[in-house]
């Protein structure tokens, strides 16, 4: 996938603490680079980085799951040339998972940004065939960005 300069990207943080934590992991420019590598589409993409409380509330409201999850994608529309979506990232969950999986937080966040962008474009992992297709694409995109296979146990 190639980058598209017509993609408007809005990066939001839920609090000054989340903003400070995010800046220690990746700059806005780097996050935008990861996004543009994951989608050739134009449109509007909003990324919101939240704490566990907000992550849990959103997951409960929209998925009826009463825990904070790493990433939630809300695609509003997409076509072959444009998309509109909000993607929510829960930084405490991402940090915890990275540690448990023996990955850097930066590598795990890059993976989840690519993952969320693919969801925004209509990719899913509800069935094995879809999962394999999505994972293969994630691995290829992350490799181009300089990251190893996120499905390996250590990085």
UniProtKB/Swiss-Prot annotation:
Record-annotated disulphide pairs: none
PROSITE patterns tied to this protein: UPF0054
Entry-linked InterPro entries: MetalPrtase_cat_dom_sf_prd (IPR023091), YbeY (IPR002036), YbeY_CS (IPR020549)
Residues bound to Zn(2+): 115, 119, 125
Any GO BP: rRNA processing
Function: Single strand-specific metallo-endoribonuclease involved in late-stage 70S ribosome quality control and in maturation of the 3' terminus of the 16S rRNA.
Family statement: Belongs to the endoribonuclease YbeY family.
NCBIfam families in UniProt: rRNA maturation RNase YbeY
Protein name: Endoribonuclease YbeY
Biological source species: Polynucleobacter asymbioticus (strain DSM 18221 / CIP 109841 / QLW-P1DMWA-1) (Polynucleobacter necessarius subsp. asymbioticus)
Lineage per the UniProt record: Bacteria, Pseudomonadati, Pseudomonadota, Betaproteobacteria, Burkholderiales
């Amino acid at each position: 996938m190639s980058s598209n300069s017509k993609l408007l990207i809005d990066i939001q943080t839920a609090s000054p603490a989340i903003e400070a934590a995010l800046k220690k992991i990746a700059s806005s420019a780097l996050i935008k680079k990861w996004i543009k590598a994951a989608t050739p589409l134009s449109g509007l993409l909003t990324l919101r980085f939240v704490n566990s409380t907000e992550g849990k509330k959103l997951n409960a409201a929209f998925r009826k799951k009463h825990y904070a999850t790493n990433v939630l994608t809300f695609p509003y529309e997409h076509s072959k040339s444009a998309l509109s979506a909000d993607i929510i990232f829960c930084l405490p969950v991402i940090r915890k998972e990275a540690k448990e999986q023996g990955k850097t937080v930066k590598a795990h966040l890059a993976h989840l940004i690519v993952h969320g962008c693919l969801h925004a474009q209509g990719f899913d992992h509800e069935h094995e065939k879809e999962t394999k297709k999505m994972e293969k694409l994630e691995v290829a995109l992350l490799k181009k960005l300089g990251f190893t296979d996120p499905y390996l146990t250590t990085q």
